Amino acid sequence: MDFKNKKWLFLAPLAGYTDLPFRSVVKKFGVDVTTSEMVSSHSLVYAFDKTSKMLEKSPLEDHFMAQISGSKESVVKEAVEKINALEHVNGIDFNCGCPAPKVANHGNGSGLLKDLNHLVKLLKTIRENTSKKITSVKVRLGFEKKIPKEIAHALNDAPVDYVVVHGRTRSDKYQKDKIDYESIALMKKILKKPVIANGEIDSVKKAFEVLQITQADGLMIGRAALRAPWIFWQIRNNTTKLPAVVKKDLVLEHFDKMVEFYGDMGVIMFRKNLHAYAKGEMQASAFRNCVNTLTEIKSMRESIEEFFNQEMLQSEVPLWVELNQKSV
């Protein structure tokens, strides 16, 4: 990965959302790196056949990272060895930022920020045992209090290719007013490896503001992409205009991929995606209530066609075939 010639754009791993169908849709809008949903090392080791489905990738994904969590060195080592057998995976990202109590309270995710020596030891274990070219880590600014300097200095001893920094502590969770890009900038000054900024990047304007403040080598975007997967295309082209794509067709394509990947269960699983796509639209509440009752492919497809038929996202910006040509 060459960080000298462009700012890289990453899709953040989001549990329950960034599966293969969604990543396939987003990839068409110019995102450089996609990452799996977080997979626990324990699940990889003891339920590999089931868990490995989360690590499948689409033909479009040329830079695909498997994100794992864990705190026990022997289990992390074995999980890495499992991933080695998956030739389509390009690298391993280690989650040290998840704030969920069921993860952090057991010393995983952001819980590792309380023991930086152990965190670095686990990263060394990953690097020593992986056959993949890329190893990365995703962190927050601290657990209860901000310790950006300490984290940055510790990670300088870790064998990683880049560091993703979410600009909040674990205690901050996802509070908007807690985002701190200045601390990411501080870590960028200390770290001797590329830094990717993450957190509350929800527009083109915000993207370039964050790059200016942090001097980061790239951006990772998650929740904003759920409703507007074209945000990566907008950043690439430095425009607030929308690509000329019919939103209905985009949503239907995503739905069809969900059904193809999950079968009939994809109908129910797609409800949460529809909630995101419909956010801010007229009659969105009624639409959400409707789709929450649907379980059949035919009825769900009809509801999607009816609701999104009212809306055409158009502009004079080039079509799909010209996406992914520019870089920031």
Curated annotation (Swiss-Prot):
It comes from the Bacteria. FMN binds at P13, L14, A15, Q67, K138, N198, G199, E200, G222, R223. InterPro entries: Aldolase_TIM, DUS-like_FMN-bd, DUS_fam, tRNA-dHydroUridine_Synthase_C, tRNA_hU_synthase_CS. It catalyses: a 5,6-dihydrouridine in tRNA + NAD(+) = a uridine in tRNA + NADH + H(+); a 5,6-dihydrouridine in tRNA + NADP(+) = a uridine in tRNA + NADPH + H(+). The active site is at C98 (proton donor). One of its GO terms (molecular function) is tRNA dihydrouridine synthase activity. Its EC number is 1.3.1.-. Its cofactor is FMN. Keywords: Flavoprotein, FMN, NADP, Oxidoreductase, RNA-binding, tRNA processing, tRNA-binding. PROSITE patterns: UPF0034. Catalyzes the synthesis of 5,6-dihydrouridine (D), a modified base found in the D-loop of most tRNAs, via the reduction of the C5-C6 double bond in target uridines. Belongs to the Dus family. This is Probable tRNA-dihydrouridine synthase. It comes from Helicobacter pylori (strain ATCC 700392 / 26695) (Campylobacter pylori). The gene is dus.
